[in-house]
Amino acid sequence: MSEEPAAKRMKNADEFPNLRSEVAGPVKEKLIELDAIQHQLDVMSENAAEEVLKVEQIFNQKRLPIYEKRKKLTTKIDNFWQTAFLNHHLLSTAIPEEQEDLLAALRDLEVQEFEDLRSGFKIIMTFDPNEYFTNEVITKSYHLQSESPSTEITEIEWKENKKPPFPEDGDSAHTFLEWLTYAALPDSDEIAEVIKDDLYVNPLQYYVMPDMQEVEEDDIEDFLNEERGVDENGQRIPRRNISDSLKVDQDESADGQEGEDEEEEDMGEEEEDGVEEEAEGEEEEEDGAIEEEGGDENVEAHVAVNPENTAE
């Protein structure tokens, strides 16, 4: 959050006092020439930074309507920001369990950089009704380019016995509620820096990440490496976006369903085969019964034709 260093001013021979006694004249002249070249490079770097800033200002304005589209979606997802905070590998350490319900009331989070992108930014938080305070919107403003950098915060209307005590070290906040309440100097506000430069830039990657308390450290590192686009050895790898991940899940689900359907179809065919075999068995029994009945009729007929056999 600190200002960029200014370009160095070109030195002259009088500003190299040590060289007068320790370095020969030709070497001293070359060093002075080198310093003049370095001055030109510093000026060019400063000019380049100004041009980059102008481009960044243009694209910062172009991002605004896209952020608005994102906002319309995130506000419709229950506990979106709470989940993103709790899954963040740094921010989650500042959120004790008893403060998680406050984050559940965080309906929207917005970062607004000042127009010149250098003088500061705001973090604007919109809350649903909660047990801590009556404010709907709380804003923290960070002013960076004045002679004495400062932080301004909305006056919070606390409910009874809900205001947290002032941080023991009097400098930095250790919990989210302390950070929300007290104004630390901009250059020591790590929570604000992480929110601005990481969480707000891409909250979705943390929303879909598994619960930080339920995953191993190696799994976290693997996930973060994938988001950075590198493998465990630091080599670049193709980055798979969230929609691709969701598509893979859907494909796996479809494959699983297809497998279940095939299994059910096989079972159905086996049942049909069993029914057919059972029917064939019944038909055989019926044929046997008919044959037996036919045999009895033949015997009776034979007896009727030869009555002497009966007399005997």
Swiss-Prot record:
What does the protein in this record do?
Answer: Potential corepressor protein, which may affect chromatin structure and/or transcription. May participate in the transcriptional repression of the presenilin protein hop-1.
Q: Which GO terms describe its cellular component?
A: chromatin; nucleus
- What InterPro entries is this protein classified in? NAP-like_sf, NAP_family
Q: Can you name the source organism? A: Caenorhabditis elegans
The record's account of tissue expression is:
Widely expressed.
The molecule here is called Suppressor of presenilin-2
Phenotype caused by lack of the gene = Loss of function results in a suppression of sel-12 mutant phenotypes, possibly by up-regulating hop-1 expression.
Chief site of localization: nucleus
* UniProt keywords, alphabetically: Nucleus, Repressor, Transcription, Transcription regulation
Q: Where is the segment annotated Disordered? A: 226-312
Q: Which family does it belong to?
A: Belongs to the nucleosome assembly protein (NAP) family.
Kindly list the biological process annotations in GO that this record carries.
Answer: nucleosome assembly; regulation of egg-laying behavior
Acidic residues: compositionally biased ranges: 251-298
SUPFAM superfamilies in the record, alphabetically?
Answer: NAP-like (SSF143113)
Annotated localization? Nucleus
Q: Which GO terms describe its molecular function?
A: chromatin binding; histone binding
